[in-house]
Amino acid sequence: MSLVKLESSDEKVFEIEKEIACMSVTIKNMIEDIGESDAPIPLPNVTSTILEKVLDYCRHHHQHPSPQGDDKKDEKRLDDIPPYDRDFCKVDQPTLFELILAANYLDIKPLLDVTCKTVANMIRGKTPEEIRKIFNIKNDFTPEEEEQIRKENEWCEDKGGN
């Protein structure tokens, strides 16, 4: 069992099995490019707190692989988040967004999918006003601009007549 050292942006070093670290396409490519080395692989876009959570996620999914399904079909489903992943994503918003950024940077598609699905579920069925409140977004549209946008997009509003 070969170990790899990863260094977070705040200079904390983590040792992890190479096979688990390579769940990240970014890390896998770095290992292939620089070869085996005792020097830690720098991850300047990921803090130690977030890297620790990402590595926990990777360890779990290495030990308990998800069944392979129809990826295209599963990508579009928002209600099929496995229990471990659902619990993993029960974090405060800033942490959830940091996990999304880390999953994207590290190229860990399953983690990116589950964190993005979690955000999608947070806004599903919400009005623009509710979404602004959830994410603390200031409404910088004038009432006239809002009305214009509503008129331009009324074709896509749910009229409740399904």
UniProtKB/Swiss-Prot annotation:
Entry keyword set: Acetylation, Cytoplasm, Glycoprotein, Hydroxylation, Nucleus, Ubl conjugation pathway
Residue numbers of 4-hydroxyproline PTMs: P143
Outcome, altering P143A: Lack of glycosylation
Biological-process GO terms, alphabetical: protein ubiquitination; SCF-dependent proteasomal ubiquitin-dependent protein catabolic process; sorocarp development
Reported modifications of this chain: O-linked glycan consists of linear Gal-Gal-Fuc-Gal-GlcNAc. Not glycosylated in prespore cells.
Source species, domain of life: Eukaryota
Family in the record: Belongs to the SKP1 family.
Protein name per Swiss-Prot or TrEMBL: SCF ubiquitin ligase complex protein SKP1b
Gene name for this UniProt entry: fpaB-1
